[in-house]
Amino acid sequence: MLSPLLRRYTWNSTWLYNARIFIALVGTTALPWWLGDAKLTIPLTLGVVAAALTDLDDRLTGRLRNLVITLFSFFIASASVELLFPWPWLFALGLTVSTISFILLGGLGQRYATIAFGALLIAIYTMLGVSLYAHWYQQPLLLIAGAVWYNLLTLTGHLIFPIRPLQDNLARSYEQLAHYLELKSRLFDPDLDDENQAPLYELALANGQLVATLNQTKASLLTRLRGDRGQRSTRRTLHYYFVAQDIHERASSSHIQYQALRDHFRYSDVMFRFQRLLSMQSLACQALSRAILLRTPYQHDARFERAFTHLDAALDRVRASGAAPEQMKALGFLLNNLRAIDAQLATIESEQVQSQAKSETENLLADDSIHGFDDIRSRLSRNMSPESALFRHAVRMSLVLCAGYAFIQLTGLQHGYWILLTSLFVCQPNYNATRHRLALRIIGTLVGVALGLPILWLVPSLEGQLMLIVITGVLFFAFRNVQYAHATMFITLLVLLCFNLLGEGFEVALPRVIDTLIGCGIAWIAVSFIWPDWKFRNLPRVLERAVNANCRYLDAILEQYHQGRDNRLAYRIARRDAHNRDAELASVVSNMSTEPNVTAEMRETAFRLLCLNHTLTSYISALGAHREKLTTPEILALLDDAVCYVDDALHHLPSDEDRVSQALNGLSARINHLEPRQDSKEPLVLQQIGLMISLLPEICRLQKQVLS
C-alpha cells in the first residue's frame, strides 16, 4: 500500500505529465551535449514541443495509429517546407493549400484537428531552422526524432497507467458537478435580490463547462470500450459516468420558481437547509473526484442522514403553520430529488449496484467517430462552403500565414518566420478568443525578452543554458492551459536560449518582439475583417437549435411517461443534445459581451433569453428526473397536449400568435380542473407543465425580437 503522501504524487497526473516533459527535454539537451553538437538541441526540442502539443488520449492501438498519422503528417509538412523554400511563389501556393487542407481535416474530428495543428506548427518550426542544415532531409528527420522520443515516453506512461486520462476526465466531471451544485445552492439564498439574474447566468455558464467536460469524458470512454466492455474496471468507469449524467439531470432540474420560493420562505430556515444540503452534495462530489484521482474508496458523509431528518422536521413545521399546499408539494418534490442524488452518491461504490444487469441499449454510448468512407465524405462536404465556420477559419488562416510570408519576402526579415508562428497560435476561430490571446501573447513576449536578456548575460555557460532550456520548457507546458501569458513568457525564454546556442541570443531578442507585434496585428485584422465570426449574428440560429433540442428532450421524456422509465440510448442522446445546445447558447451570449458591434439592447435580450432557456431546460429536466410510467388517461392526454403546445408555441408563425395563446390558456385551465392522485408523480407533472407554460410568453416575445 502506498502512503497518502506518496499516493498523492504517484497518481497526480499533472506531476506525471510534467515529469514526462522533463525527461523528454533532458534527452533532447543531454544527447547533443554528449555528442558535442549543441545545434542538435534546437530541432530535437522543437520536435518534442510539437509532439507534446498534439498528444491525444486513446487506447494503445489508437495511440499507435495516431503516432503513425502524426509522424507522416509532420514529415510531409517539414519536407515540403525544405523542398519548396527556394521558390517563393511555389512556397506561397503550398502554404495556402496545405493550411486550408490541414484545417479542413479537423472536420473529421478532434483527433485530426489536433494533428493538423501540429503539422502546421512543425512546418513553421522548419522555416525557423531552414538554414541550419545543408541537406533538405536533415532537419525534418531531427524534428521527427524529437517527436518519436516524446511519443516513446508517452507510450511507456500509457502502459504503466492505461486508464489514467479517463480517470482524470471522470474526476474533472465530478469537480465541475460540484461547482455546479455550489452555484445552484446560491439560488436558495433568501437575501438574494429578486431582480438579480447574475446567479442564473453564472449557473448557465457553469452548465456549459460541465457539459463540455462530460462530453470529453464520454469521448475518452468510447476509445476504451471497444472490445473491453466486460472488464471490471470498464464497468466501474461506465457506472461512474452514468451516475454523473443522472446527477447532472437532477441537479439541473427546477421544481419551483425561485423568486416565489424566496418570497414565501424568506424568514424560514427551510431555505438555508436546502442551501446547506446542496452545498454538502457539492462537497461530496469534490470528495468523490479526489477519490477517483487517488484511486481510494469514496466514503459518503454520515451527516447527510441528519441533515435530511432536520429538513423533514422543518418542512413539517412550515406545513403546520398553514403554508400553501402547492408550495409544500413543490418542496416535497425538490426534497425527493435531493434524496435521489444522495442515494446515487451513497451507493456509487457498491459492487451490487455496479453489477446490476442492464439492457444492452442502457449501456451503449453514442459514438460520434468516423464510420466508413461515406461518413468521411459527408463530414468534409459539410465544411466546403462559407456557411461553415471551419471553412471560414481555414481560408482566414491561410490568408494570415500568406500575408506574414509576403511581409517577410518584401522586407527581408532574417527571423521573420516568428510572425507566422505568432499568428498560428493567436488567430482563433472567433474574435473574442483571438482578442484574449493577442493581449496575453504580447505581454508574455515582452516579459520573456525583458527577463531573457539578463539571463543570457548571467548564464553564459553551455551547460547552464541547456539546464534553463529544460526548466523553461517544463514551465511552458505547466502553464499553457492555466495561464497563457506565463506560458508565452517561458516559451520566449526557451527560444532565446535555443538560438543563443548558435550565438544569436541577443540578436533575436528585438526581432522576437517586433515579429510578435506584427503577427498579432495580422491576426487581429483577419478576425475583424475576413469573414468575422461575430457571435451576435449566430444568435438566431443557435437559439433555434436550443429550442429544437428542448422540444426533442420533451418528446423523449413523454415516451417514458407512457412506456416506463429506462436509460436507453435515444433518451440519453436527447438529454445530452438539450444540454449541449444550452451550453452553446451560453457560449454565444458570453462572447457577445465583448464584441464591438453589439448594442446594449441586443446584449440584454440575449442575456435574458439565455436565462429563460436554461430555466426551461431545468423545468424539463425535472420531468426527466422523476419520469415513470403513468396510467391515468387524463394526465397522459394533458401531457401529450402540453408537449405539442410547447413545440407549437416555440415554432409558430407571427400570424398564429392568437391561436397559440388561446391553446396555452386552455391548457392552464385544464391543469386547474384536474385532480391528480397524490401518491403518484401526477402532481409533479402538472406542476412542471404549469412552470413551462409560464415561461413561454416571454420566450416567444424575445425570440421574435431576435429573429426580426
Predicted regions and their residues:
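Alpha-helical transmembrane segments and their membrane-interface boundaries
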Residues: M1-L120, Y125-P162, G332-F490, C498-L517, ...
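Long, hydrophobic alpha-helical segments that serve as membrane-spanning/inserting helices
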Residues: M1-A19, A30, W34, D55-L56, ...
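Elongated alpha-helical scaffolds
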Residues: L95-T99, F242-R250, L616
